[in-house]
From Swiss-Prot:
One of its GO terms (biological process) is protein transport. Interacts with the Sec translocase complex via SecD. Specifically interacts with transmembrane segments of nascent integral membrane proteins during membrane integration. This is Membrane protein insertase YidC. Pfam families: 60KD_IMP, YidC_periplas. HAMAP family: YidC_type1 (MF_01810). The gene is yidC. Signal peptide: none annotated. The chain crosses the membrane at residues 5-25, 346-366, 416-436, 486-506. It is found in: Cell inner membrane. One of its GO terms (cellular component) is plasma membrane.
Length: 528
């Protein structure tokens, strides 16, 4: 979708300016013809001295399988003593649909133990991912700044005592995961812990939420985004300077974040047609008899909200792909949210920010239009020069440049001011296209979700009409073929925008209306 927008905009600019504003009309008698990632040293996991003693732990024996429910202001999570894994997680502030009775967004929902998330495996220590843990917890209900902990403990057949602790805060999506091992055996053990996440592949054709879908990893100071389809070729692995790994769609994500260099490697693999697994490895651990070690992570399950992700640290906000113009998209999104705080309507906020951008760029637009007018006045003389030097292109170019110099006209004066605005356009496009704030946000009348297409296609059609009017107001000296090409652009844009988010169409529509008003004013203010 984004590629189509880029191509269409570049095409329209090229046609508008290259033919109608700069070059003279054609004369009838003159035809111008991933590979393996290198290994790197990883920082050691935080060691716990041998004087640190874990609580007395029962052997697994007949420990029963139980579900423990954690309810906060933001989500409801269900953990199982089977693997001390995450069985279900539901976001309380987001719905699957915008209408009444919509179900809450479910990020995890599994019944089979081997498909739980946040399972821990350590074969060298005898830790199996689906072992049944002991827990004295009975669930948690937290609000505001309240904190609570779920603790799970188990002893492996090798004599390794293992404890998993999940720490929650009532008003935060962050979950702190602390894992501690104690070697109660007379034998030294060496190895790594693996934290396993199972991600169900459930992309639905036509569902805007899954336009962006798959793993994202920040490794070696670079965002690595993978498509689910690419894993049919084999797994992906990262093992250098990993800050976090995540699985995301357009609006929501889950992530495992490093805590004190606790991620040594990440392996991503498609285990079957329905699941993609991330395997997060700790740095090497060496446990002498009586010694302990800890491996900690930060866990995130929640919305891809710019401010929320930034608050998690570790550059997690970079999971939102704002493209090349991220430095512009982020402040534009914050500005949009600022206006929403006063209007309580993102549609009105979009209109306000569009008006402000038009006012800011008015001097450039005025200069551009004035330059185009001056270029038009020179068209007859340029045609004469072209006829005069039709057999000597170099001489013609020199004569044209002398003409520009004599009349103090910059041939790029009409284009450059418009080119300056292109980064702002694409930045705002990205901000609107991938903003969770617009998800299920109503505007007015029939538009009840600015992240979804206009259900009756009214705004795209009106947008196409305004493009046609705007085109007619732009003076040109095109031949019939070029004129037909230009007439096709509004039609192409209209069909292209039929399935675009209505918030983005609203921006373009308002921008077109303001451009028409602006051109009307400039036409009246400039001499003929």
């Amino acid at each position: 979708m984004e590629k189509r927008v880029v191509i269409a905009v570049i095409l329209s600019i090229a046609v508008l300016y290259a033919y109608s504003m700069i070059f003279p009309p054609p004369q009838k008698k003159d035809v111008v013809k991933p590979g393996p990632v290198p290994q790197s040293q990883t920082a050691p996991v935080q060691a716990v001295s041998s004087t640190s003693v874990l609580p007395a732990i029962m052997q697994q024996g007949n420990v029963s399988v139980r579900d423990l429910v954690v309810e906060t202001d933001l989500f409801t999570a269900v953990f199982s003593t089977r693997g001390a894994g995450l069985k279900k997680l539901v976001l309380k502030r987001y719905k699957e649909t915008s209408g009444p009775g919509g179900r809450e967004v479910v990020l995890v929902n599994e019944e089979a133990a081997e498909k739980f998330s946040l399972l821990t495996e350590g074969k060298s220590f005898g830790i199996e991912p689906t072992v049944v843990y002991n827990s004295i917890s009975n669930g948690l209900k937290l609000a505001g700044n309240e904190k609570g902990t779920l603790e799970f403990t188990s002893t492996s057949p090798t004599g390794i005592v293992f404890k998993k602790s999940y720490i929650f805060t009532g008003n935060d999506y962050r979950i702190d995961l602390h894992q501690e091992l104690l070697n109660n055996s007379p034998t030294k053990f060496d190895g790594s812990l693996h934290l396993i996440g199972n991600n169900r592949i459930e992309a639905k054709p036509g569902d805007g939420r899954f336009e962006v879908y798959g793993p994202v990893t920040l490794a070696d100071d670079k965002i690595n985004t993978e498509k689910v389809a690419d894993f049919s070729k084999g797994p992906k692995q990262y093992d250098k300077n990993i800050l976090w790994t995540a699985f995301a769609d357009k609006y929501f994500m889950n992530a495992i974040l490093s805590d004190n260099n606790s991620i040594a490697a990440v392996r991503l693999a498609k285990v079957n047609t329905n699941y993609l697994q991330d395997d997060v490895s700790s740095p090497p651990l060496a446990l002498n008899p009586g010694q302990s070690a800890a491996v900690n992570y930060r866990i995130f399950y929640g919305p891809k909200d710019l401010e929320i992700l930034k608050g998690q640290g570790s550059r997690l906000e970079e999971a939102i792909d704002f493209g090349w113009f991220s430095a512009l998209a982020k402040p534009l999104l914050r500005t949009l949210k600022f206006f929403y705080s006063y209007t309580h309507n993102y549609g009105i906020a979009i209109i306000i920010i569009t008006v402000i951008l038009k006012l800011l760029f008015f001097p450039l637009t005025h200069k551009s239009y004035k330059s185009m007018k001056e270029m038009q006045k020179l068209q007859p003389k340029m045609a004469e020069l072209k006829e005069k030097f039709k057999n000597d292109r170099d001489a013609m170019n020199r004569a044209v440049m002398d003409l520009y110099k004599t009349h103090k006209v910059n041939p790029m004066g009409g284009c450059l001011p418009m080119i300056v605005q292109i980064p702002v356009f694409f930045a705002l496009y990205k901000a609107l296209m991938f903003s969770i704030e617009l998800r299920h946000a109503p505007f007015m009348l029939w538009i009840m979700d600015l992240s979804a297409k206009d259900p009756y296609y009214v705004t795209p059609v009106i947008m196409g009409v305004t493009m046609f009017v705007q085109q007619k107001m732009t003076p040109s000296n095109m031949d019939p073929v070029q004129a037909k090409m230009m007439l096709a652009l509004p039609v192409v844009f209209t069909f292209m925008f039929l399935n675009f988010p209505s918030g983005l169409v609203l921006y373009w529509l308002v921008n077109n209306i303001l451009t028409i008003a602006q051109q009307t004013y400039i036409n009246k203010s400039l001499p003929s």
